[in-house]
Amino acid sequence: MDTSSINAQSIFDDNAATLKLSWLTGHEGWERGFSADTVGNATSSADLVGHLNLIHPNRIQVLGEAEIDYYQRQTDEDRSRHMAELIALEPPFLVVAGGAAAPPELVLRCTRSSTPLFTTPMSAAAVIDSLRLYMSRILAPRATLHGVFIDILGMGVLLTGDSGLGKSELGLELISRGHGLVADDAVDFVRLGPDFVEGRCPPLLQNLLEVRGLGLLDIKTIFGETAVRRKMKLKLIVQLVRRPDGEFQRLPLESQTVDVLGLPISKVTIQVAAGRNLAVLVEAAVRNTILQLRGIDTLRDFMDRQRLAMQDPDSQFPGKLV
């Protein structure tokens, strides 16, 4: 992953208001950031931000009241040694939290080494939690996929397929039926957790839907605030096909999935043909997926009925064909 854009300046700009940060000294080191090896070897954002630690280099070091109190109780020789070790680690920046006064020697060494030094009245724990969440977001795996991302019945659904199949028209029909648009054409996905992928719309395309013959439609203006969504978790991919290929199955025995950022996402394939109500079919696919997530599999239930009927032809059970 390219980490060149992640530096002290960008992190300060994004978090200054939330964390009430003040840039005390070391402005010349605004380009300081994380090395590619540091990010690659980190198992989580917790490895990149934490309390004062002289063992792990190239991480954001936060000094709270406890660390400052410990520093004040040291001898002059130990203070100088600890400060030298801290600066030698070349952290992206240091944060003195809890409203504590930055030790003069720390300020002096940060100034000489161009190490950014921030201060904040917020507690060290709050600063660390906030920065870890921030780092997990900006360093999370990302991908941009083509399609229309819709909120259908509270489930994030990505409509995909070849150009000209009517994905945008289908999206418009679903929006008119009360569902919400997240993004059209290009959808930015990011894996923020071990079990979910979140999709958003690029700022340039916010609230817009392109329909052939009509051009760009501002969905928020036409249908109202409730017709758009800022983000949704991706739960289902609906692939539109012009005609079934050799691998198309009317009753697939195994659920289809698509790998998105390392996470398997459920997929259904719907054939586009004259006279088919695609909006109703997509809604039905979503409702069926919701049932499957709750442990209800209609096809499996039918196969169980069929097996019982074959084992005991005289048995009477709901749904038996006569």
UniProtKB/Swiss-Prot annotation:
Which top EC class is given? transferase
> Which cofactor(s) does the record list?
Mg(2+)
Give EC number(s), comma-separated. Answer: 2.7.11.-, 2.7.4.-
User: Which of this chain's residues are annotated to bind Mg(2+)?
Assistant: S168, E210
Pfam families recorded: Hpr_kinase_C, Hpr_kinase_N
Q: Name one GO biological process term.
A: regulation of carbohydrate metabolic process
Q: Which residues form the active site?
A: H146, K167, D185 (proton acceptor), R250
The membrane spanning regions, by residue number, are none
Q: Could you tell me which InterPro entries the record lists for this protein? A: HPr(Ser)_kin/Pase (IPR003755), Hpr_kin/Pase_C (IPR011104), Hpr_kin/Pase_Hpr_N (IPR011126), P-loop_NTPase (IPR027417), Ser_kin/Pase_Hpr-like_N_sf (IPR028979)
State the residue spans of region: Important for the catalytic mechanism of both phosphorylation and dephosphorylation: 209-218
Give the binding site residues for ATP: G161, D162, S163, G164, L165, G166, K167, S168
Q: Which domain of life is it from?
A: Bacteria
- According to the record, the residues making up region (Important for the catalytic mechanism of dephosphorylation) are 271-276
Q: What keyword terms does UniProt attach to this protein? A: ATP-binding, Kinase, Magnesium, Metal-binding, Multifunctional enzyme, Nucleotide-binding, Serine/threonine-protein kinase, Transferase
Question: Has UniProt tagged this entry with the keyword Transport?
Answer: no
Catalysed transformations (reactions): [HPr protein]-L-serine + ATP = [HPr protein]-O-phospho-L-serine + ADP + H(+); [HPr protein]-O-phospho-L-serine + phosphate + H(+) = [HPr protein]-L-serine + diphosphate
In the record's own words, the domains note is:
The Walker A ATP-binding motif also binds Pi and PPi.
Under the subunit heading, UniProt states: Homohexamer.
What is the protein's known function? Catalyzes the ATP- as well as the pyrophosphate-dependent phosphorylation of a specific serine residue in HPr, a phosphocarrier protein of the phosphoenolpyruvate-dependent sugar phosphotransferase system (PTS). HprK/P also catalyzes the pyrophosphate-producing, inorganic phosphate-dependent dephosphorylation (phosphorolysis) of seryl-phosphorylated HPr (P-Ser-HPr).
Q: Can you tell me which family this protein belongs to?
A: Belongs to the HPrK/P family.
Other observations noted: Both phosphorylation and phosphorolysis are carried out by the same active site and suggest a common mechanism for both reactions.
Q: Which protein is depicted?
A: HPr kinase/phosphorylase
